Regions:
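Non-catalytic interaction/Regulatory regions outside core domains
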Residues: 1-117
């Protein structure tokens, strides 16, 4: 059976991925693989506040629980995907990456990913 480490490694092998990070709702790292230029602990520490605001928005807009958030920056994107109520996957993506394919795969394999936690 695949593990969280296998998931992180598989995502990291995709073209254009700078980091794949699995973290708890509290922002603490569970597992990660990242380029040397990415401070995974620092990046993960910012995710809980983003999650809180995104979930508040979803509640106010009557959209339900957060499944995936995509934040686009000038130099790439950050994708945050819920693995369970207490674990999240953060993927840092370069502009050259196939973001659509990544999002499709995360959605298609959501149940399998959730089973890893």
């Amino acid at each position: 059976m695949p593990t969280i480490r296998d998931l992180v490694a598989a995502i990291r092998r995709r073209d254009g991925i700078d980091a794949a990070v699995v973290l708890g709702r509290d922002g603490l790292l569970i597992d990660h693989q990242a380029d040397a230029s990415v401070n995974a602990e620092s990046v993960a520490a910012h995710v809980p506040s983003i999650l809180q605001y995104a979930e508040d928005l979803g509640a106010s807009a009557d959209r339900g629980h957060l499944l995936t958030a995509v934040i686009e920056y000038r130099s790439g994107s950050a994708v945050i995907a819920a693995m369970s109520a207490d674990a999240f996957l953060l993927v840092l993506v370069r502009p050259t990456a196939d973001l659509g394919a990544l999002l499709f795969d995360l959605r298609r394999h959501r149940a399998n990913i959730a089973a890893l936690v």
